[in-house]
Amino acid sequence: TQHKLNLVDDYRLSSFWIFVDNVARILTEQYGQISVFEHGAFSDASSTSCGTVHAHLHLVPISFSLVDESIQYDKNLNWQHCKVAEIKDIAGQKEYLFVADRYASQETTGMIHVLDMGVSQFFRKVIANKLGIPNQYNYRTNPMHESATEAATQLREKTQSVISSEL
């Protein structure tokens, strides 16, 4: 496998969507509706990668429109409608933010903003702001280990139950 900083090429692969579909199904069964987002970095040194320096897609169970909240959070950003498979064509070699309120596999449609410069933890800031805890967005200073551990335990149990039922 090849190390990647973003998922622009993977969004066009059926094998990628088989994996994500399984994860999304488990998350939806456990928590309900999920939103999707990616901080699309193109450089190891970019603040957009949020320190992870690995491509990753966020599937997050939330009860509000992350698209609407993202647009409202910073009205200076130029958002446009986009299917995930179109991200590469729209962003080119520039960094981007992508967000969708509904997961629909490779047909997932949301909004994209092509960045002029890197931005760190944008969607964490949006979510924390909406939840009324705007100063707790930073995972470095507020890692929320208890919530993460609880979710990991729930998902481990759910995944084991799904695997057992499919055998």
Feature annotation, model-predicted:
Residues T1-L167:
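HIT superfamily nucleotide-processing domains
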